Amino acid sequence: LPGIQTMTLSATQRAFIFLILALVMAGTRINHFAAIPDASWAVFFVAGFYLRGSWRWAFALLIAIAVLVDLLVITGQGLNFWQHYCVSPAYWFLLAAYGAMWAGGAFLRKFHTGSAAQGLGLLATCLLVSASVCFVISNGSFYWLSSQVATRSFAGWVENMGHWYFGYLRTSVMYVLLATGLHLVVSQLLRTRSGAVQISGRG
């Protein structure tokens, strides 16, 4: 990811990024498992990358937005939020699950050095590890704590994870790759613009 070390974001730029991420999460979270895959995992990863440090409070606000969207969707269907099968004791483990995604993005931003190839390698590693931890927390907490699972066993949990893991990973990779592409395009445009300004200034 070229330009990470020298990329300094203004408060306005960070606010714009936060707004875009919040809208993407809200817009896709409404459609859980529908035609548009939920981007929540990727949103927290990308937010950790761009908003770590002085904007870390954005994590709590994104969590609040996620809960609000769930509340609106469930009650909009005429159902009781607290009695919905998704809102089991495992629901609150999403704090830790999404925290893993945020931490993955923050780690990438903090420790990336070297070439673009090395950056992409670290991106792949951070995303794989954080998404896997996120999945184990969210899937495991639901399997072991939700009343939806009648008979629990370790073998059953492993089988259940096998059914869902790659789908969630694929969705996260898809959205993060899209964000990476946008990052590279914008970085290139900014460098081109900066170079044009310098050339114009010399004239």
Where in the sequence are the language-model features?
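Hydrophobic core segments of transmembrane alpha-helices in multi-pass, intramembrane catalytic enzymes
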Residues: 40-44, 93-101, 175-179
